[in-house]
Amino acid sequence: MIIIEKIKRGLIVSCQALENEPLHSSFIMSKMALAAKMGGAIGIRANGVNDISQIKLEVDLPIIGIIKRNYNNCDVFITPTMKEIDELCNEGVDIIALDATFRNRPDSVSLDDFFKSIKKKYPKQCLMADISSLDEAINADKLGFDFIGTTLYGYTKSTNGLDIADNDFNFLKTLINSNLKSTLIVEGKIDTPLKAQKCFEMGVDLVVVGGAITRPVEITKKFVEKINQVKR
């Protein structure tokens, strides 16, 4: 696919802001994406059709699109149903990322059936699997996802609190050694340039960084926390 050729190696910046954050604005996210491009980013990850449409007016970079939507009594919220897929496809998104964990989906459809339904309706759409474990990555690879991201490692009940850098990046090493056919994208808790560099040194070609670049409230808190540790 052409999009895979355009997004071969480099940094992808996730430009997202939650509703309770000061930068929650499609206009601001579009400017954040422009700043990311000016800094050398080769792609953008964005949430919601409004943000994505505004970002497309500012940059011509490939976009990984998601829609975060909560459903009752369901932990899956990243592009969880065909409704979100339809919205993203109608907008025209280069890559759609979705939760590819083994957790129950809101409509009780299995991931396998969901993937097949998407491919039947949108056969040319590139898809990214957001996973949290090796078994989920292997399953996504067998299904035929174009990309597999470590997005949810550390964010599910079974991996809560884990960091991609734990044990000298052991989880990432395991994924790399699994010889996945899908292109691997490292995402989640890549909060320093050195962590990103380490991923590339290990052989990964695509890394997504979000909060460390685009969430000034959280960045400020980290500085303040360290400063406040100094006792006088």
From Swiss-Prot:
Enzyme Commission number(s) of this protein: 5.1.3.9
Job of this protein: Converts N-acetylmannosamine-6-phosphate (ManNAc-6-P) to N-acetylglucosamine-6-phosphate (GlcNAc-6-P).
Record key words, sorted: Carbohydrate metabolism, Isomerase
GO cellular component, one term: cytosol
Name of the encoding gene: nanE
Lineage of the species this protein comes from: Bacteria, Pseudomonadati, Spirochaetota, Spirochaetia, Spirochaetales
Protein name, as recorded: Putative N-acetylmannosamine-6-phosphate 2-epimerase
Residues annotated as signal peptide: none
HAMAP family per UniProt: ManNAc6P_epimer (MF_01235)
Acetylation listed as a keyword: no
InterPro entries linked to this entry: Aldolase_TIM (IPR013785), NanE (IPR007260), RibuloseP-bd_barrel (IPR011060)
Pathway: Amino-sugar metabolism; N-acetylneuraminate degradation; D-fructose 6-phosphate from N-acetylneuraminate: step 3/5
One Gene Ontology term of the molecular function aspect: N-acylglucosamine-6-phosphate 2-epimerase activity
Catalytic function, reaction form: an N-acyl-D-glucosamine 6-phosphate = an N-acyl-D-mannosamine 6-phosphate
Homology family: Belongs to the NanE family.
NCBIfam families: PRK01130.1
